[in-house]
Swiss-Prot record:
Cellular compartments per GO CC: cytoplasm
EC class (word): ligase
GO BP annotation list: argininosuccinate metabolic process; L-arginine biosynthetic process; urea cycle
GO MF: argininosuccinate synthase activity; ATP binding
Record's keyword terms, sorted: Amino-acid biosynthesis, Arginine biosynthesis, ATP-binding, Cytoplasm, Ligase, Nucleotide-binding
Organism: Endomicrobium trichonymphae
Binding site for L-citrulline: Y100, S105, N136, R140, S189, S198, E274, Y286
Reactions that this protein is recorded to catalyse: L-citrulline + L-aspartate + ATP = 2-(N(omega)-L-arginino)succinate + AMP + diphosphate + H(+)
Stated name of the protein: Argininosuccinate synthase
SUPFAM superfamilies in the cross-refs: Adenine nucleotide alpha hydrolases-like (SSF52402), Argininosuccinate synthetase, C-terminal domain (SSF69864)
Family: Belongs to the argininosuccinate synthase family. Type 1 subfamily.
EC number of the protein: 6.3.4.5
Length: 413
């Protein structure tokens, strides 16, 4: 944890003496540091949680200080982000609306968790976030804050100030000489972490506009991807990825390595119109290369390691689990209960899946499972000594009895 202190004794009012701001250095939180200090007359502490933003964190301490923070915390939470948030979601194969790998949804609760620690340490009266009044993040942050520190005041500037658009926010920053990473010409809102990068706003709000190729940071276009396919094998132990091509990596290293490999082969791009929690539809463009590969490999390993009934029921729960994460309910009893069930299903999900990556496509080419339920002798169309074809007749008669009875009764009417 890095802390940068600046001498500051602001005049307090309204009972709020100190506020911890969830700080990223982006447009919204950059102007919020200044706005909170101006409008609440209190001490402002900036807290940035590192979940894999990379270069976005460079110079953040100095920037926070220049913008009005008395202290700035940068907390490295990358390992916890992977082990406590990403890995459980891989075990479930949770996709929101069958498309979204939940990159932002998973980052918000761990950011809130670390900010809550700083609020307690600083004995702050309030916590502040930069989520807009139209987005999902306001719900995710505030439900997490209420779960972790129910008695702390929450300040949401986008629901208080006169700034109505990103253009207004850019003007506010310009008047106060606050450096921000967007312009009116390219007002994209982006969110980056180990698991993905998301892009929203600007020209993307018109559904007829194709995204600009220059926007992408983690992946190349299919046209620029290698003409030769890339092969790799992902090994899992009890549902958790542990190695690539036999080489073991730490959780953060594994995700980072897969992002590089898959991104170079144009894996993991998605242009989605999704249903926001607050009721509207919105368009988001995402890069999730490691997520796409790990989900594909894990799902394939499960197909040979888990029995039919458990697998089918688990697939139903995956949809609900994705909603829980997306809707900001990570700290709910239901999510904890589902994790207990999911962990039980993963006891025998150990093995390796070989994949071929080619110009945006993920192709499964080989499977090995320590506890495989697949039997070549039983599945073969050639002669075998286990399966008696005559047994099928009795099974079909019993299985089809309700169908037969329904048809007979309807015919007699």
């Amino acid at each position: 944890m890095a802390i940068n202190k600046v001498s500051s004794k602001p005049v307090c009012r309204d009972g709020v003496k100190k506020v911890v701001v969830a700080y990223s250095g982006g447009l919204d939180t950059s102007i919020i540091l200044s706005w909170v200090k101006e409008n609440y007359g209190c001490e402002v502490v900036a807290c940035c949680v590192d979940v894999g933003q990379g270069k976005e964190l460079e110079g953040l301490d100095e920037k926070a200080k220049k913008t009005g923070a008395s202290k700035s915390y940068i907390i490295d939470a990358k390992k916890e982000f992977v082990t406590n948030y990403i890995y459980p979601t891989i075990k479930v194969n949770a996709l929101y609306e069958n498309k979204y790998y939940l990159g932002t949804s998973l980052a918000r609760p761990i950011i809130a968790e670390k900010i809550a620690d700083v609020v307690k340490k600083e004995k702050a009266d309030a916590v502040c976030h930069g989520a807009t009044g139209k987005g999902n993040d306001q719900v995710r942050f505030e439900l997490a804050f209420k779960s972790l520190m129910p008695n702390v005041k929450i300040i949401a500037p986008w629901r208080e100030w006169d700034i109505k658009s990103r253009e207004d926010a850019i003007d506010y920053a310009k008047k106060r000489d606050i450096s921000v990473p967007v312009t009116k010409a390219k007002p994209y809102s982006s969110d980056a972490n180990l698991w993905h990068i998301s892009y929203e706003g600007g020209v993307l709000e018109d559904l007829e506009n194709e995204y600009d190729e220059s926007m992408f940071k983690m992946t190349v276009s299919p046209e620029k991807a290698p003409d030769k396919p890339m092969y790799l094998a992902i090994a899992f132990e009890q549902g958790i990825p542990v190695s690539i091509d036999g080489n073991k990596f730490t959780p953060v290293e594994l995700i980072t390595k897969l992002n590089e490999i898959a991104g170079a082969n144009s894996i993991g791009r998605a242009d989605i119109v999704e249903n926001r929690l607050v009721g509207m539809k919105s368009r988001g463009v995402y890069e999730s290369p490691a997520a796409a590969v790990l989900y594909a490999a894990h799902e394939e390993l499960e197909s040979i390691s888990i029995d039919r009934d458990t697998l089918h029921f688990k697939q139903l729960l995956a949809h609900k689990y994705a909603e829980i994460a997306y809707y900001g309910l990570w700290f709910s009893p239901l999510r904890e209960a589902l994790d207990a069930f999911i962990n039980e299903t993963q006891k025998y999900v150990t093995g390796s899946i070989k994949l071929k990556l080619y110009k945006g496509n993920i192709i499964i080419v080989a499977r090995q499972a320590k506890y495989s339920l697949y039997s070549e002798k039983l599945a073969t169309f050639e002669k075998d000594e286990i399966y008696n074809h005559k047994d099928a007749e009795g099974f079909i008669n019993l299985w089809g009895l309700p169908t037969k009875m329904q048809a007979m009764l309807r015919k007699s009417e």
